[in-house]
Amino acid sequence: MVRASEQEQETYRSRLFNFKWRNNDNNSATRHNKSLSVETGLDEAATGSHDAEPLTIIHPSQGPPLSRSAADEAVLAALAASQARERQLLADMEQMKERFSKLLLGEDNSGGGKGVSSALALSNAITNLAASVFGEQRRLEPMPAERRARWRKEIDWLLSVTDYVVEFAPSQQKNKDGTNMEIMTTRQRTDLHMNIPALKKLDAMLIDCLENFKDQSEFSYISKDSPDLDGKRNDEKWWIPTVKVPPDGLSEASRRFLQYQKDCVNQVLKAAMAINAQVLFEMEIPESYIDSLPKNGRASLGDQMYKNITVDFFDPDQFLSSMDMSSEHKIVDLKNRIEASIIIWKRKMVYKDNKSSAPWASGVSLEKREVFEERAETILLILKQRYPGISQSSLDISKIQFNEDVGQAVLESYSRILESLAYTVLSRIDDVLEADRAGNKRNTPLEAEEETLVGSMTLSDFMGWDFDQAANAELESKKDLPDDPLIKEKLSVVTTKKTSYLETLGGVKSPTARH
């Protein structure tokens, strides 16, 4: 009995002490309240009291107090999210180690030193990444969030190498005594500093263009196994889903929207092509490619093609119309021949070695060889603009394969895959517009004729080389002339003179003059 009374008094003093301690310490009220609540609960449990209220935790933010179960769930949810982020970071770290280990090994997992150069390994890594991410982009629809996040994450890994490709630049440093001293500091290389942000912007524009088709509902796609697919399937694009448009065609708003997106993608395509062409131009020509070239331009082009290029009055559009370009293989072969002849003529104009004294070298003057080289470069430029999705030429492949500049390798591969993606999106937009044109018959014969005339405009018409129109005007003017033979003779002397190709170009410079 006495022991129970002493225990009860001790409990009372302890509770009184805790109450005074809580009132005296105002700076840590939350912690003391929790301690008082816990100790009070223990005291009441010791004295056999079961009327105490359940323990509650006050949330720091304003709002009703959470019960023990709700607080536990919130803590567990936050803990699970933190663990998920940690697991994702570990997975990304392992993936990054795998990627860069392959780059360091040069794609030679045996480690025997037989791998490719760092530049080629990085170029192949960017190309393979784009193929795995954009290879299934066959419709005008947004990219899945998972693929988009993977592309952004892994391309940033590969592009991060360019942050450490630097060059020395002069700078001013102010000393403690107030004097200025010129020092050399490092900065990112100029070509990378200018082109990498531009390519990232083009990349974002292409992905945003695909995102703009998220809410469209006027056209859809039919799979190749669908019963709605008619028999008029184009076998040349059998792997691409067929576009289905409404019977009355697309609305005018949809046509304007598609045309606007097409114009935007076309600008991206032109910018990517320009960067890629500039980088390829700056790459060194491998010695192995030079050794494989024939002796002269005639041997590279062939007799008939050489004759068409070296005529007195040259029209590039007429030259291309005389070539057989019915397949991609023939177009690439034409590019290879043209590029080889350009390299041969350039080397003969620049280098004066023992080969220049050969009998065949004395037949063409330096001025004529320069004219032939400009004509060949014009043909090559037209081919690249007319067939942007064509395969790479032998010269481009050789430059990429033997290139040792890491910065140029990144710029070339990144611009090339953006060029390929832009061309793919442009083709998908053209598929929808073509399905719309084929689906409705709203065009009158006059409108169809106007479209044919616009679509058949040649390069000669665009550049002002209207030889046929000049000839027709000459015939019309001759009908109204008197029968004076002197006047006719003067007219024939004036009108039969054709402007040469170089004079017609005027201020347009060749690619060699720009560099």
Curated annotation (Swiss-Prot):
Gene3D superfamilies per record: PRONE domain, subdomain 1, PRONE domain, subdomain 2
PANTHER family: ROP GUANINE NUCLEOTIDE EXCHANGE FACTOR 1 (PTHR33101), ROP GUANINE NUCLEOTIDE EXCHANGE FACTOR 12 (PTHR33101:SF10)
Location relative to the cell: Cytoplasm; Cell membrane
Subunit structure: Interacts (via C-terminus) with PRK2. Interacts with PRK6.
Alphabetical keyword list: Cell membrane, Cytoplasm, Guanine-nucleotide releasing factor, Membrane, Phosphoprotein
Domain (PRONE): residue spans on this chain: 83-446
GO BP of this protein: embryo development ending in seed dormancy; pollen tube growth; regulation of pollen tube growth
Name of the gene: ROPGEF12
Role of this protein: Guanine-nucleotide exchange factor (GEF) that acts as an activator of Rop (Rho of plants) GTPases by promoting the exchange of GDP for GTP. May be recruited by PRK2 at the plasma membrane to maintain polar Rop activity in the pollen tube and control polarized pollen tube growth.
GO molecular function: guanyl-nucleotide exchange factor activity
Modification sites for Phosphoserine: S510
Any single GO CC term annotated in Swiss-Prot or TrEMBL for this entry: cytoplasm
Outcome of substituting S510A: No effect on pollen tube growth
Biological source species: Arabidopsis thaliana
Lineage top rank: taxon: Eukaryota
Tissue expression pattern: Expressed in pollen grains.
Main localization category: cytoplasm
Descriptive protein name: Rop guanine nucleotide exchange factor 12
Activity regulation remarks: Phosphorylation at Ser-510 by PRK2 may release ROPGEF12 auto-inhibition, thereby activating ROPGEF12 and downstream Rop signaling.
Keyword hit for Membrane: yes
Pfam families: PRONE
Domain notes: The PRONE (plant-specific Rop nucleotide exchanger) domain is responsible for the GEF activity.
